[in-house]
Amino acid sequence: MKLIIFGAGYVGSALLKDLQTRDYQIYITTTQEKRVDELKSLGKEVFIINDKTDFRDLILPCDGMIVLVAPGQLKSYEETYLNTAQKIASTLKDRKKPFFLLYTSSTSVCEGVQEDWITEGTPLNPISENGKILLKTEQIYLESGVEACILRLGGIYGPNRTLLDRAKRFSGKIMNSSGDEPTNHIHLDDILRAILFCLDHTLKGVYHLVNDDHRTRKVLYTSLCQIAHLQPPIWSSMTSHKGYKVSNSKIKKAGFSFAHPMLQIGKD
């Protein structure tokens, strides 16, 4: 199987290493010329892409693709997500052979929903412009005419991106929140395992990828700050946003099991 990976950031770089044990011909894209030498050993070929790149020569020879793009400092959500999706969908519209596409979205598309639990079938109407862009991007991939799988990721944590590091940034800060909102996280290991699971089983449609641990922001970050001997965040008592818990039951029913179902405070 010829597989092209769009995006070699935090998740993409880790995935490329995991794919080395698989019988795939891997093609890699990057927007940074300085990363070509680093990525060469992880794939058959590395392509530098920009706004003028013709995606047809990259995508059409392949049997599938994984889209893991993320905005850089100078790129907007529209440029990174929506424009990329439109170009990919336009490239795939006349494809006759089977093709599998997996895109990692975000549970932030669920913002503004006034329900305690959110499933993949919950009607969405994002409030922010970025949320609207992410939801539109999902729709473009789902309507692209190929077998498409959307993984909505919770807050990512793992090596070099720990929850403790995040707590340090929040320490002593006044938060525009009561802290009573549930959290929805996912460990890097489970993201990689879920992507491979979706590839192996050709899952189609939208799947939430969050763990089973939804302790509140106040409980989580107070615990983390105590471990690090830091002042906890200062929570506001006035907020109209109660937050929500994202359900992972659909991907579990498909057969996926989590390596990190619960947060291990101080061990991430």
Give short role names for the model-derived ranges:
Residues 60-102, 136:
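NAD(P)-cofactor binding segment of oxidoreductase domains
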